[in-house]
Amino acid sequence: MSGAAPAPQDDEPRIGPNAILQTIGVLDRHLGRAERDRVMRLAGVPVPPPDSGMLPESQCRAVHQALRVDQGEAAEGLLWLSGLATGDYILANRIPGFAKAIIRVLPGFLGARLLAAAITKHAWTFVGSGRFRVESFRPLTFRIDDNPLRADAAERPSCFWHAAVFERLFGTLVWPEVTVEEISCASVSGGPCLFVLHPKGKKTAMPSSVHSG
């Protein structure tokens, strides 16, 4: 099953365009234009223009799922790189310079709380119809219920795109050695997706075929 997107409805929840645009960029760089076009055809989603606004949630989900179907385990690394690139875009274009400066000079636990609050405020842009909240501050843990970008099914936690976005943001602004570990995933258990941030890092199984972002 390709998971091709249904026709979007006017009232459909939407997700920021980087969920697709940065994935397209990663595919172009690592697999080439022909493979990218194949994934998009499999998803049943047109290539959005670079200046796209918020995109239908179903299209974002379809592209991520089509990539998983087409690339198998290699999709993990590609979605990770897309998440890192999305984090870079947010840092460059969505967080004001003064806010970044304040977060950087604060003690880690305070900077983390400030950044977590900003992420919570704008969570609708990356969870669509899902629900986001800070589950815990010790350790800092994010929770997404009904994550629209989850895999249809998986044997282990597989929300690499979200984990990479969080890791890039907190690694750049708060904890340089941070790693993000998804300890529970809707794709596996049907429950919430839980992401734990380890400020000093933790050895975890990296996504397949991850190269430098």
UniProtKB/Swiss-Prot annotation:
Alphabetically ordered keywords of this record: Bacteriochlorophyll biosynthesis, Chlorophyll biosynthesis, Photosynthesis
Phylogenetic placement of the source organism: Bacteria, Pseudomonadati, Pseudomonadota, Alphaproteobacteria, Rhodobacterales
UniProt superkingdom: Bacteria
A Pfam match: V4R
UniProt pathway annotation: Porphyrin-containing compound metabolism; bacteriochlorophyll biosynthesis (light-independent)
Signal peptide per UniProt: none
The keyword DNA damage appears for this protein: no
Native source species: Rhodobacter capsulatus (strain ATCC BAA-309 / NBRC 16581 / SB1003)
Database matches in InterPro entries: BchJ, NO_sig/Golgi_transp_ligand-bd, V4R
Residue ranges of the TM segments: none
NCBIfam families given in the database record: BchJ (TIGR02019)
Protein name (Swiss-Prot/TrEMBL): Bacteriochlorophyll synthase 23 kDa chain
UniProt GO BP: bacteriochlorophyll biosynthetic process; light-independent bacteriochlorophyll biosynthetic process; photosynthesis
Residue stretches in coiled coil: none
